[in-house]
Amino acid sequence: MLMIVQLLVFALGLAVAVPIQNYTQSPSQRDESSQWVSPHYYPTPQGGRLQDVWQEAYARAKAIVGQMTIVEKVNLTTGTGWQLDPCVGNTGSVPRFGIPNLCLQDGPLGVRFADFVTGYPSGLATGATFNKDLFLQRGQALGHEFNSKGVHIALGPAVGPLGVKARGGRNFEAFGSDPYLQGTAAAATIKGLQENNVMACVKHFIGNEQEKYRQPDDINPATNQTTKEAISANIPDRAMHALYLWPFADSVRAGVGSVMCSYNRVNNTYACENSYMMNHLLKEELGFQGFVVSDWGAQLSGVYSAISGLDMSMPGEVYGGWNTGTSFWGQNLTKAIYNETVPIERLDDMATRILAALYATNSFPTEDHLPNFSSWTTKEYGNKYYADNTTEIVKVNYNVDPSNDFTEDTALKVAEESIVLLKNENNTLPISPEKAKRLLLSGIAAGPDPIGYQCEDQSCTNGALFQGWGSGSVGSPKYQVTPFEEISYLARKNKMQFDYIRESYDLAQVTKVASDAHLSIVVVSAASGEGYITVDGNQGDRKNLTLWNNGDKLIETVAENCANTVVVVTSTGQINFEGFADHPNVTAIVWAGPLGDRSGTAIANILFGKANPSGHLPFTIAKTDDDYIPIETYSPSSGEPEDNHLVENDLLVDYRYFEEKNIEPRYAFGYGLSYNEYEVSNAKVSAAKKVDEELPEPATYLSEFSYQNAKDSKNPSDAFAPADLNRVNEYLYPYLDSNVTLKDGNYEYPDGYSTEQRTTPNQPGGGLGGNDALWEVAYNSTDKFVPQGNSTDKFVPQLYLKHPEDGKFETPIQLRGFEKVELSPGEKKTVDLRLLRRDLSVWDTTRQSWIVESGTYEALIGVAVNDIKTSVLFTI
């Protein structure tokens, strides 16, 4: 019988094919039409060819993949579909080798869609602690809870967005607006997760700096027209390496098992089919040995994404076609393998990378370590496959409580240490019950939301701010403590007269009560989230930087009537402080990012002195909103929006911009008051290793490998479904239909396409996170600190580096070290900060490598980028 296998080549959203002869050139060069382009780079580097700690994992993975059939390999690469299996993402299983459906679950703040879990302090709040120990402990606590709920792969941490746009919707998920801070926090988080046998998935790779236009089919507000393509984050070459790629390098060095590619385009090619980003930058230059998974629906092509370095498609269906049973991969990837449009070696590499990552991170699941919850229902029993109501009824929720003393203590510690004291006149804080016997608390953001907190992905914003909204939120935390609950408790405990006024619009009662109060606390907020939810006209990104729920007017009213007003700002990013920062009656201001479930406890503990403030700002707060990089809302008539603000600012992101332009901020990056001042002495910088200008050449790759059975099946009947398969509606299977046979594919490959593996990495590559020499200690900085106050406090010495003024590459000041230190009165402590070779390096766009320029460097030691206590010159 003659049967036809017709490869379905989906072209939806394919990148513009750019004919570039030298596909190793920088993607930041403009073509004649001034369009930013991302060159092609092939093939995908085969995993397992670095001489590193992944070798054992690859040996174990190869032993299994070498015995797998084509459909078994395909089943590992493709999600089974939305709302069918219990997690937000689920791969197919391979029962013959004891591999169950892999469970991938959001997110960076805790286990999404699961009961009894903890909503942890956001990444932004965590970054504000500047505490490396807490970075790790939070990761360990997250790992414990994910593991306890049966999750195999946690979709976090987030280091994209980098936070270059103050109004960016998802800034709260990541750790702040500096790549060094982000990378340090991400690496520790990854280690903590993976120590608990849960694979981390660092995201979003790369340039996902705003929610507006992040996907096709968005609305241009100026024309009301639908966009054709997602926004292109146009990123220059130096900025790509020095800023956006930097924390991903830290993540790879930490052994992260998976990387999630983002929805947006990067230099006019979609991130999940961008061969330069995935094949060259991530897998070759950074030496990433794990697998790349698409953001949910971010895969916009079949063959093209496969040869460009994508390894796993989630949730499996095509963009815009969830619960339709239609996939770019699954059955279509099987077809592409049989007609050789996608090389079998690429499929082998996908499957091997996935299994090797499971082994390397100790997250390889057993058949009895499965999800004990359903993402889709809170009921104890439900359909085995939720979206197919014809399937059997089984127990889907086991009500497992994953928390313990360690997880709860960690959540509170991180929340407390993240709170930043911005102003404290007349020693207003900590609150003295003897001096402030009548206490007023006001603001919607102090109390519970009238509709509770289990609203759609935490988009309820008429109460205390615990999280931002979207897939990065925790939908069903075990409990949440508002500032009202804990402040009222401490007020009663201290026998204070206490009142709480929730009303933030009709301010007559606030005016009356504030005039009688000895001290007034005003809790205000500003929220943001993911772009698929719009709250009060905020489509993920914030429309402006004002406070929500009339917060600015509330502060003004209270301060005009109470001479001792404390303002507590809780927000997902920067807000405008100019209306009240200098008000004489606003005697204290604290800022907190989304603090998670223990938010109220942490805030109250800081205000009443049960814990001392030790947080530092993870971003710059400007005096004027025009000093921030704006959200791009313009879309041309072509319907292909581009973000050139990233080009215009280049390396000058956040504090780099303010320092370079000599702009005085309201509050600088790294700023945070404590109850002590600190004296710095004996500052030294000493060489640990001779540093040459150029990196050493990396070791050659290990030999390329192939599986003996890679070409053993050319009979499509081998890929037919088993006769006894009981199909689930809209479930994605890898099997070919039984009425097909093989036909040669007719795919037009991009210019420069090749399947020939390289024998040697490029110069900046060759190791996890890049050339191993980049990670060697080059210099040590030592400084002695002595507290000048009477309390035991924690503070954060910060090291900023200035490059030689006569260097070839103009390089702005940048954070290159920090350490959180606790000192008692009179105690002296020496703090050692290490400078790695990469910390001294600049990206040479001509050589396409990192170099260390000769000349005089300056190490500046301070407690904020604009509050330097001492500096040391050293010459290379």
Swiss-Prot record:
The active site is at residue 295. It catalyses: Hydrolysis of terminal, non-reducing beta-D-glucosyl residues with release of beta-D-glucose. Residues 1-17 form the signal peptide. SMART domains: Fn3_like. Keywords: Carbohydrate metabolism, Cellulose degradation, Glycoprotein, Glycosidase, Hydrolase, Polysaccharide degradation, Signal. InterPro entries: Cellulose_deg_GH3 (IPR050288), Fn3-like (IPR026891), Glyco_hydro_3_AS (IPR019800), Glyco_hydro_3_C (IPR002772), Glyco_hydro_3_C_sf (IPR036881), Glyco_hydro_3_N (IPR001764), Glyco_hydro_3_N_sf (IPR036962), Glycoside_hydrolase_SF (IPR017853). The keyword Signal applies. It is an enzyme of class 3 (hydrolase). GO terms for molecular function: beta-glucosidase activity. PROSITE patterns: GLYCOSYL_HYDROL_F3. GO terms for biological process: cellulose catabolic process. Its EC number is 3.2.1.21. Gene3D superfamilies: Glycoside hydrolase family 3 C-terminal domain (3.40.50.1700), Glycoside hydrolase, family 3, N-terminal domain (3.20.20.300), Immunoglobulins (2.60.40.10). Pathway: Glycan metabolism; cellulose degradation. Belongs to the glycosyl hydrolase 3 family. PANTHER family: BETA-GLUCOSIDASE, BETA-GLUCOSIDASE F-RELATED. This is Beta-glucosidase 1. It comes from Saccharomycopsis fibuligera (Yeast).
